[in-house]
Amino acid sequence: MTDFLIAFGSQTGQAETIAKSLKEKAELIGLTPRLHALDENEKKFNLNEEKLCAIVVSSTGDGDAPDNCARFVRRINRNSLENEYLKNLDYVLLGLGDSNYSSYQTIPRKIDKQLTALGANRLFDRAEADDQVGLELEVEPWIEKFFATLASRFDISADKMNAITESSNLKLNQVKTEEEKKALLQKRIEDEESDDEGRGRVIGIDMLIPEHYDYPEISLLKGSQTLSNDENLRVPIAPQPFIVSSVSNRKLPEDTKLEWQNLCKMPGVVTKPFEVLVVSAEFVTDPFSKKIKTKRMITVDFGDHAAELQYEPGDAIYFCVPNPALEVNFILKRCGVLDIADQQCELSINPKTEKINAQIPGHVHKITTLRHMFTTCLDIRRAPGRPLIRVLAESTSDPNEKRRLLELCSAQGMKDFTDFVRTPGLSLADMLFAFPNVKPPVDRLIELLPRLIPRPYSMSSYENRKARLIYSEMEFPATDGRRHSRKGLATDWLNSLRIGDKVQVLGKEPARFRLPPLGMTKNSAGKLPLLMVGPGTGVSVFLSFLHFLRKLKQDSPSDFVDVPRVLFFGCRDSSVDAIYMSELEMFVSEGILTDLIICESEQKGERVQDGLRKYLDKVLPFLTASTESKIFICGDAKGMSKDVWQCFSDIVASDQGIPDLEAKKKLMDLKKSDQYIEDVWG
């Protein structure tokens, strides 16, 4: 028997990508793994009948299970299951997460604990990969342990194991003097400038042009002397090629309808794509202020789709955000296909491929255009992973570039990869600017670029037909290896929208962060005490809560009870970035909000955590109350989620005279009972 199970729970696709990579590597050494989402348990597999399972899973939202894993988590936690239900199962588990969130690794830990409780045997320690420091730092050692386990379990020879790793003896040209080092770097710069002036520009087509950047001595372009001199780099085998694109000499017929990403299913999406109309687009802060991030507001009209969506306060919608044309043009030009990018392109499986069970990705059309694929289907902004860098190394005519790219995807170069690629968030374009002689085959990019994921935005209004969203502009300067200043992918696109534009959106599955909470009637929401914490644009979702309560009070006064509804709103300076202050003050004057507490970090040195400590009398009842109250936290996760969590823990510990660990357990009880609910983002 050479088969075993690989199961994943993935919201954004990272866990699924790792799981697929495990499957491909296992097949290279002669095994026959089966790959399934965890929610396919009791449908396409039965965990209690498996002998070996590798699980790759993440947490999402407020410590929630990914949408293709939530059912699995519920099923393995049934009280009816016996303690030895999984006694025949050996398993390994890799958890993915982001330590900026207070709910870090919640689901991987929960699954691990429950599998053990049901009698399963974990073969080695669970790994917890942290996106804040680089997933690879934990993922790669875990994969090595897993394949060592497979080698032992299935008696796989050393020769076969060599099929998934290789050593590279390619060395940098021996550069001994400072003058020679400078000459080498100067050649890189000249190659790059030549690329800008020649290959990088096409008459009549706008093209992304890099900004000048002086790379430090140790950087993306050159590693340490130790790494540069290592003659035995352990680099992964390049992924097997399997796609062939055939471009005809004619355009795609005008009546061809290319549905968004081939209508490929995505976890958390509950509708097909549909068009909405942009009815307003405006600034909500001064766009010329240098003190704050610019914030904007977009309103869309759902039209006839309003009844289908039936959104509630706290719900979000996905926007189908495309890649910028300048970047798409540059990448297609570097691949040598820009001049045929708008002609009909047909994808097929290479009949000579050695890849087992090769399939065209479901999110791309088999008949399409290269421009359409690279604009709407493939993520060119996400930092390239090591498999893609491995392919880039094979796509350059410069041996020095090849050596450095091999270093970046090698086991020895993992820290360099994290420091110079993953952490600064380099894009594919940044990598191509840095290595001007890399000309990747377009088919390899189609195979290896991840799916372009739509961007979710919570709605800040409560109307049947229209939805308002508020967002901060994200800025990324040309530093740390990024070769062009840019805004966030969604920011740039949202900024371009004008009244009358039509855009595609998708309905998002309701989460726990909503009013009324799941399982509660609309009328009962008017009796619910609320503590809301919203720094920055985090306050926007609470506007939808308050508009809903205002309508409830107008339509059904008897259901609107005088209970505490407290909002802590964090901003830098209320005179410049306290967005929708007049709206919030209206809610106070009408009795919708009982308390509006403004925390100004720049003017008064007060963050929302300081406000919570200052107004203990308003906060404590929510930390000791029954299930009839709710705490909602919304905002940027960069430290805020953990800091607010610690603040509440400090308050509980001080009030009850208990240790911090015990206070955190009490807070965790609030989370488990859905009294403490977060909606935070990175």
Curated annotation (Swiss-Prot):
This is Methionine synthase reductase. GO terms for biological process: homocysteine metabolic process; methionine biosynthetic process. It comes from Caenorhabditis elegans. Residues 4-147 form the Flavodoxin-like domain. GO terms for molecular function: [methionine synthase] reductase (NADPH) activity; flavin adenine dinucleotide binding; FMN binding. FAD binds at residues 455-458, 488-491, 681. GO terms for cellular component: cytosol. Residues 271-516 form the FAD-binding FR-type domain. Involved in the reductive regeneration of cob(I)alamin cofactor required for the maintenance of methionine synthase in a functional state. Its cofactor is FAD; FMN. SUPFAM superfamilies: Ferredoxin reductase-like, C-terminal NADP-linked domain (SSF52343), Flavoproteins (SSF52218), Riboflavin synthase domain-like (SSF63380). Its EC number is 1.16.1.8. It catalyses: 2 methylcob(III)alamin-[methionine synthase] + 2 S-adenosyl-L-homocysteine + NADP(+) + H(+) = 2 cob(II)alamin-[methionine synthase] + 2 S-adenosyl-L-methionine + NADPH. NADP(+) binds at residues 293, 607-609, 643. It is an enzyme of class 1 (oxidoreductase). FMN binds at residues 93-124. Keywords: Amino-acid biosynthesis, FAD, Flavoprotein, FMN, Methionine biosynthesis, NADP, Oxidoreductase, S-adenosyl-L-methionine.
